Swiss-Prot record:
Transmembrane segments: 7-27
Organism taxonomic ancestry: Bacteria, Pseudomonadati, Pseudomonadota, Gammaproteobacteria, Pseudomonadales
Entry GO terms, CC: membrane; type IV pilus
Protein name, as recorded: Fimbrial protein
Record keyword Isomerase present: no
């Protein structure tokens, strides 16, 4: 009798079934991981801008959106980042703060994100009354970056 060489059809079918089960579990988990990292990237794009706003307010200056140089005659500091600096979305500043009497909002709208975050917004708001920053997001609860709330 000849010795068997290779795999039988049933063995190959079992391997294919195992790979299918692993893929069914791994792909959704990877998509969730990508969605969480998009939120973290958006927050990381906006968070450092708080320093620019605080510095301008401490000097009694205003902050304008976009890039450029300080204008001492207008007492104006650029935000220091282009609106489209992150490929995941856009950054906006409202209102342009001058004397700290109005609440300041930095928003990141995720226009270039994946399907789970498309159009979602991360907002950093500085209240004029106490000068504290608060991060909120309209993302699904599981994708909101640490330090933000719904």
């Amino acid at each position: 009798m000849k010795a068997q060489k290779g795999f039988t059809l049933i063995e190959l079918m079992i391997v294919v079934a195992i790979i299918g089960i692993l893929a069914a579990i791994a792909i959704p988990q990877y998509q969730n991981y990508v969605a969480r990292s998009e939120g973290a990237s958006a927050l990381a794009s906006v968070n450092p801008l708080k320093t620019t706003v605080e510095e301008a307010l401490s000097r009694g200056w205003s902050v304008k959106s976009g890039t450029g140089t300080e204008d001492a005659t207008k007492k104006e500091v650029p935000l220091g980042v282009a609106a489209d600096a992150n490929k995941l979305g856009t950054i906006a500043l409202k209102p342009d703060p001058a004397d700290g009497t109005a609440d300041i909002t930095l928003t990141f709208t995720m226009g270039g994100a994946g399907p789970k975050n498309k159009g979602k917004i991360i907002t950093l708001t500085r209240t004029a009354a106490d000068g504290l920053w608060k991060c909120t997001s309209d993302q699904d609860e599981q994708f909101i970056p640490k330090g933000c709330s719904r």
